[in-house]
């Protein structure tokens, strides 16, 4: 028996939904439960359901880490930021061992916006294969909310910005499970806000 085209479309749609990982809240919108920080907590606070990291030019940097470790996962969140100096905002999301970072804002070393690009540390820094060269066309202006989706699966790291694929990078070196870290870069006057943080292990 042949199925109508409409029925086949429904089956395909439900199949896609079944394959979609179930994202659960990573941040409760009330406090820093489930996270830990190195040293002082003065860099981090929660206001009106928003997780805020803030620094000034005189302060050292800081990381806010998840208490749990993650290997293969997908995470979605809304983020907006504002820098009050010419250097702008320099932050990112750390993951895996040894740490690989998804850059948010201006790279301190390159002095250009590398949002959505993968930073692997020295000697490569931002390998060309992992750069989000079209990120500026995908993102809303500074100060507005942008939705990021990050997936770490096997040796491949993928980033989507506002629903559009921005970068993909493959590197077998970053294989160990580790906490996720939100960065506040040292010596930069900046504010970065997160909301609707949801994650699913894969």
Please give the residue ranges for each predicted region:
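Carbohydrate-interacting regions of secretory-pathway proteins
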Residues: 16-202
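Bacterial N-terminal signal peptides
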Residues: 5-15
């Amino acid at each position: 028996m042949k199925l109508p085209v409409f029925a086949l479309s429904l089956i395909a749609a439900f199949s896609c939904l079944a394959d979609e990982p179930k994202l659960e809240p990573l941040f409760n919108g009330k406090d820093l439960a489930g996270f830990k920080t190195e040293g002082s907590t003065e860099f981090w606070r929660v206001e009106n359901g928003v997780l805020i990291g803030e620094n000034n030019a005189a302060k050292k940097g800081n990381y806010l880490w998840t208490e749990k470790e993650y290997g293969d996962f997908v995470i979605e969140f809304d983020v907006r930021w504002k820098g009050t100096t010419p250097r702008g905002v320099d932050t990112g999301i750390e993951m895996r061992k040894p740490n690989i970072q998804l850059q948010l804002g201006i790279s301190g070393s390159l002095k250009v916006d590398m949002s959505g690009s993968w930073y692997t540390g020295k000697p490569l820094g931002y390998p060309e294969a992992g750069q989000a060269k079209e990120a500026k066309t995908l993102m809303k202006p500074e100060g507005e909310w942008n939705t990021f989706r990050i997936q770490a699966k096997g040796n491949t790291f993928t980033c989507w910005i506002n629903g559009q694929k921005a970068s993909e990078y493959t590197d077998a070196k970053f294989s160990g499970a580790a906490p996720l870290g939100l960065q506040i870069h040292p010596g930069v006057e900046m504010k970065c806000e997160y909301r609707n943080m949801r994650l699913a292990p894969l």
